[in-house]
Amino acid sequence: IKGVVEFVYAQNTGVAFSLFDGGRWFFIALTLAVTVLCIIYMYKGKGQSNLWLFWSLGVIVSGAIGNLIDRIFLGYVIDFINPTFVNFAVFNIADCAVTLGTISLMAYLLFDIFKKENKDEPAN
């Protein structure tokens, strides 16, 4: 779509949106650790009983695995979405999944905190 987005080929050795260039093995280890912990929590912890939390973690994990596959086999992540209407980093669908899942997770946690605070307040 001219003036909005274009497809390009970019090799990203950093993390989401080309941040922190380099450190391939560190990012692989970190991604594996976080992914495994999320999956364990999804199936052993509270994640299984709450659809919002389960969805948020699942979207984060799916994006992380997508980028992890590229990083392990290629040494970099292939980014291809370039928003031309704003000066922004080139990114991919997995980056979108991690970002949207994280936003959803933060919203869930805020909602959960406020719900607990309201529960603790005495009724007038």
Predicted regions mapped to residue ranges:
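Alpha-helical transmembrane bundles and membrane-interface segments of multipass inner-membrane proteins
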Residues: 1-124
